[in-house]
Each structure stands twice: as C-alpha cells, then as structure tokens.
Amino acid sequence: MDIVFMGTPDFAANILQKLIEEPQFNIKLVVTQPDKPVGRKQILTPPPVKEFALKFNLNVVQPDRLKGNEEFFEVLKKINPEVIVVVAYGKILPKEILQIPKYGCINVHASLLPEYRGAAPIQRVLMDGKNYTGITIMKMDEGLDTGDILLQEGIEIEQNDDVITLSKKLSELGAKLLIETLKNISNIVPVKQDATKATYAPPIDKKEGQISWDMSAVQIYNRFRALKIWPGIFTIYKGKLLKIHEMEIAKLDNLENVQNGTILGINETGILVKVKDGVIKLKELQLEGGRKMSARDFVNGYKIKKGDILS
C-alpha cells in the first residue's frame, strides 16, 4: 500500500516508525511542518518527524502552507497514494488534498471522539482530571475532527501519568489501531460521530501555565502533569516568574485560618505550601533568570523559611 505520511511531533514519529516496520506499507512521502527556531538562542530545529524520516532516507517536504498550494497538490497527485495518514500534523487539510487518495485521508486522533476534538486532547484530558481516554482512527472530512470513526479503543489514565507518559501510551495504541485499520481498510464500515456529545480541546495558551495558591491541590497537580512539556506551571514570587518543575500533593492537618500560599514546612524532599483545600509539596523550582534548583537549594539560596508567603 502506497502511503503519504503527514505528521510533526514525537507522537507522530513513533507511529511512522511502526508503519515503516510493516513490509506491506510503502511510505512514498513524508510531509511535516517547516523547521522552527527553538530555545533562547532561537536555533533553527527540524520537527521530530523530519529527523526520523531522514534516518530512513524517506523523501520529506515541508510546505509553508497547504491551502491554494498547487505545486504541492501536483506532487501528491503524481504520487497517487492509496491513503494519506495524518498524525498531529498541525494544519487543517483542504478539500483538494482530502480527495486525492483512493481510501481518503486517515487521521490518528488522541481522544475518544467526539470528545476532545482539537489540537490538545492529551493536555486537556489531563487538566480535566479524567481517568479514561483513548485513540480514534478517523476518515477525515473538512471539519475539525468531525469525520467518520473507523476504529476506536480506550485506555485508563493512571494517577501518575503526565503528558509525556500518556502521549507514549497513546502513540503505541495509535500505531496498533492504525495498522489494523490500514490492513482492513476495504472492509471497515465507518460510523458517524454523535455531534451532540462533542467536546473541544483548543490549543494550550502559555498563560494557562500560571497557577494560583487559591486553586485546589488536585487542580494544580492536574495542570502540572498536563503542561509538563510546555509551558510548564509557574507562579509569581517577589515580582518574578517562579517555575515549578517537580511537585506532588501532600497531606497536613489543622490548616484552618492559614492563608493560601503560606509555607507550612520545609524538609529534605520539598517545600510544603498551603493551597485552597490542602497542601502541595514543591520539589524542584526555578526563579526567573536563575537555574533549576532542588527545593533544598532554593530554600538555602533565597533564605525562605516556614511561615513565609509565596507571592
């Protein structure tokens, strides 16, 4: 089966690898986003899918745009793929592309559609504190994740899962379901989504990383594990941005009349902070302009003590 693969992040690269390992699939072209400046030094960096594809000597293209890109349309028509596989590519496909392959464009989406349609289903399901999610293999149409369902399977979200671990699990499941779908593509009966049950997973805004001590411990923890890759969670301390790199929920009693944000205790493993309904333990921190520190080094470096208020 001749395939064009469209994808960008590690999640997609893992699935591409599984496709390459299947001898009946011939990856004719890999389409990914353009290289982008990354980090403080703004170093031009290729997306993970490009790096992976080049290791296997696959043909790679990186169009700046899809809509109205006649040159790119002609490239696809010349290849004449039986299917275009789309995994976290990052752009909506125009009708001209959807109509090219014999079996259409097949998307691997990291949620149980119609729930969590959109760009950030893994982050949003973690932020919402859900304990179940999954993968949907969908035949794409012109809408945002509105196409017919070809295959679907759910998995449990563990309490200690974060965006990194859950992405890996879903990527593995996505590869398995995609391969199963492609092998049986001519026999699968598509199922329409129930639009009345649709929920949405819009892109993450950097501002969503800011937490407040007036939030509950679970809210803060869910945001921490959802936004661990980007933008991370942070608060403001003495007018500077304070990033929280590692944390956990803790327990202490007799917290009535204690102001949220108060440091309740300091030990070898972390700083205990009062929040809306309990306590969190800060284990690794970084103040704006400084380096990442263990809680112990942070306490020593900034002369923090029990009873101080982090604000």
From Swiss-Prot:
Cellular component terms (Gene Ontology): cytosol
SUPFAM superfamilies given in the database record: FMT C-terminal domain-like, Formyltransferase
Record-level Gene Ontology MF annotations: methionyl-tRNA formyltransferase activity
EC number: 2.1.2.9
Alphabetized InterPro entries for the sequence: Fmt, Formyl_trans_C, Formyl_transf_N, Formyl_transf_N_sf, Formyl_transferase-like_C_sf, GART_AS, Met-tRNA-FMT_C, Met-tRNA-FMT_N
HAMAP family: Formyl_trans
Stated role: Attaches a formyl group to the free amino group of methionyl-tRNA(fMet). The formyl group appears to play a dual role in the initiator identity of N-formylmethionyl-tRNA by promoting its recognition by IF2 and preventing the misappropriation of this tRNA by the elongation apparatus.
Protein name stated in the entry: Methionyl-tRNA formyltransferase
Phylogenetic placement of the source organism: Bacteria, Bacillati, Bacillota, Bacillota incertae sedis, Caldicellulosiruptorales
Gene coding for it: fmt
